[in-house]
């Protein structure tokens, strides 16, 4: 709606201007401070200029009023125009807030957890954010592809195989074993050990077979990770292997050398990242000739940046913050614009239950399993809470609040608004088609404000995507639900003289809730279950 109004205003003003959303919708739906920016050029007061501009909008069909207030130009949209927008939305509900196809393209790499165990709650935040960003981008018309980078070549994979081998020796063959300082533990390792022993037999379990054992376990873990993601309604387009990039390492090193991005010292090859803003240079090839994790990651990012996407986005854990300058430095040395590599950081999550820290899973070792939380509160509640705060801020929540059936549970509260609307339609014995002819002229000021809020969803979605601030969507839904409940409690609907106008208004509110929830990966309920 905002873009439509902007274009209507621009037809009259014929210049560039900023269009703002005043908090008090009783004053105006939209406002522009244009008069202030013209004051110096025209050598007139902002109030005089605003009054002059307001006079140009007399008898405009879109606006109920256009007023000059303290130098601002305030616009109130007419009921007739709001009704036209409502009719468009209700006639084509599947296209409500959808954007036209755009030329911009994105590649999002996210989750990319080591395939050495099940996903934990820390992985879940970035996973939910990335999946919602994907849904939103595609809804708005962008080409948006997703990818999972499988770290299948490093020491972590070897440790997975070693951990299983030691578990077999200790728990099945009853041998005395000495565990290294770093290894994987938890019931899932014992389960893998048991399954591997049944599959391969006793003779297989020797050090020379650790790589084969690790590969087998890695594949099992990838299947489990995909299941964990699907449980939370997350699907990633493609999975790419770290190993598949090793053959391209030499060519990448040559390119870096050509651009003076690397040098040799102390028998190692260093990335000269301090030249590009990093705090120090980084080793990419060790003394023994083995590449570091950074080396493989540079090759992978070089490939991503070469595929023709307008922007490559990564979602990383907040502990990778220091990794950003070195990766951007490498991309600049390779001739790419590092601004086209965008990094979103997912901060830590603290989980409580009844006010106490949530118990760690014995199955996972010392982590809270993502699947355990989904089993307990459902994927809808999990997704909502992870989207409720900016991704790069610490999140603490008590899962007990998400099991309550009252206003303290935002998922319940918003769903109750949606279900309540269906209940009102049922009580009135009507369907949406029965109220499409309503013209909304009888709506009071609160009703108009609620209608405006419901129709303003697309502006919220655009802002949320452009700022990567997905918390704007649940914030919007909470406010919309609160305003709906308040309006419902203050106005008689069924049997009132303006029943059809109110039902049409409510149908717009329901459509906005359903659309926004769908983009969050949440199902809007038509009926509340108790």
UniProtKB/Swiss-Prot annotation:
Name of the featured protein: Arginine--tRNA ligase
UniProtKB keywords: Aminoacyl-tRNA synthetase, ATP-binding, Cytoplasm, Ligase, Nucleotide-binding, Protein biosynthesis
A Pfam family matched in the record: Arg_tRNA_synt_N
Catalytic reaction(s) noted: tRNA(Arg) + L-arginine + ATP = L-arginyl-tRNA(Arg) + AMP + diphosphate
Gene label: argS
Motif 'HIGH' region positions after renumbering to this chain: 113-123
Subunit structure: Monomer.
EC number(s) reported in the record: 6.1.1.19
Family label: Belongs to the class-I aminoacyl-tRNA synthetase family.
Organism: Campylobacter jejuni subsp. doylei (strain ATCC BAA-1458 / RM4099 / 269.97)
Record-annotated membrane-spanning stretches: none
NCBIfam families: argS
Source lineage: Bacteria, Pseudomonadati, Campylobacterota, Epsilonproteobacteria, Campylobacterales
GO cellular component: cytoplasm
MF terms in GO: arginine-tRNA ligase activity; ATP binding
SMART domains the record matches: Arg_tRNA_synt_N, DALR_1
Record's keyword annotation contains Zinc: no
GO biological process per UniProt: arginyl-tRNA aminoacylation
Annotated localization: Cytoplasm
């Amino acid at each position: 709606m905002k873009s439509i109004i902007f274009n209507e205003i621009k037809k009259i003003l014929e210049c560039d201007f900023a269009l703002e959303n005043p908090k008090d919708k009783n004053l105006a739906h939209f406002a522009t401070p244009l008069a202030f920016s013209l004051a110096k050029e025209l050598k007139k007061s902002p109030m005089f200029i605003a009054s002059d501009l307001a006079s140009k909008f007399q008898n405009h069909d879109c606006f109920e009023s256009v007023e000059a207030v303290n130098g601002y130009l305030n616009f109130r949209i007419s009921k007739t125009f709001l009704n036209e927008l409502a009719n468009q939305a209700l006639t084509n509900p599947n296209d409500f807030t959808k954007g036209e196809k755009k030329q911009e393209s994105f590649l999002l790499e996210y989750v990319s957890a080591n395939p050495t165990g099940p996903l934990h709650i820390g992985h879940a935040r970035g996973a939910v954010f990335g999946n919602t960003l994907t849904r939103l981008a595609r809804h708005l018309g962008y080409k948006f592809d997703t990818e999972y980078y499988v770290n299948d070549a490093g020491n972590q994979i070897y440790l997975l195989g070693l951990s299983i081998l030691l578990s077999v020796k200790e728990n099945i063959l009853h041998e005395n074993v000495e565990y290294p300082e770093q290894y994987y533990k938890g019931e899932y390792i014992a389960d893998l050990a048991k399954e591997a022993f049944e599959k391969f037999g006793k003779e297989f379990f020797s050090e020379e077979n650790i790589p084969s054992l690790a590969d087998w376990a890695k594949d099992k873990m990838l299947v489990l990770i995909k299941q964990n993601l699907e449980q939370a309604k997350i699907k990633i387009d493609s999975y790419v292997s770290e190993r598949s990039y090793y053959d391209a390492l030499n060519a990448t090193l040559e390119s870096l050398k050509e651009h003076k991005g690397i040098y040799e010292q102390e028998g190692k090859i260093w990335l000269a990242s301090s030249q590009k803003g990093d705090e120090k240079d980084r080793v990419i090839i060790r003394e023994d000739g083995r590449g570091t994790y950074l080396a493989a990651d540079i090759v992978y990012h070089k490939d991503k940046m070469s595929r023709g996407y307008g922007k490559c986005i990564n979602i990383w854990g907040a502990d990778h913050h220091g990794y950003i300058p070195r990766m951007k430095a490498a991309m600049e040395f390779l001739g790419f614009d590092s601004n086209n590599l965008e990094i979103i950081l997912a901060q830590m999550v603290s989980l409580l239950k009844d006010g106490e820290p949530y118990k760690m899973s014995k199955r996972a070792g010392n982590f809270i399993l993502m699947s355990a939380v989904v089993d307990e509160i459902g994927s809808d509640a999990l997704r909502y809470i992870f989207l409720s705060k900016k991704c790069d801020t610490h999140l603490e929540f008590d899962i007990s609040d998400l099991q309550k059936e009252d206003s303290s549970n935002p998922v319940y509260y918003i769903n109750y608004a949606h279900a309540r609307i269906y209940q009102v339609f049922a009580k009135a014995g009507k369907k949406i088609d029965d109220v499409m002819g309503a013209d909304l002229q009888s709506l009071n000021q609160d009703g108009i404000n609620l209608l405006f809020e419901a129709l303003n969803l697309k502006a919220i979605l655009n802002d949320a995507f452009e700022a990567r601030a997905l918390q704007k969507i649940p914030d919007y839904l909470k406010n919309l639900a609160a305003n709906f409940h308040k309006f419902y409690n203050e106005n008689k609907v069924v049997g009132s003289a303006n029943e059809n106008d109110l039902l049409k208004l409510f149908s717009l509110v329901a459509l906005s809730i359903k659309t926004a929830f769908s983009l969050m990966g949440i199902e809007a309920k038509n009926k509340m279950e108790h």
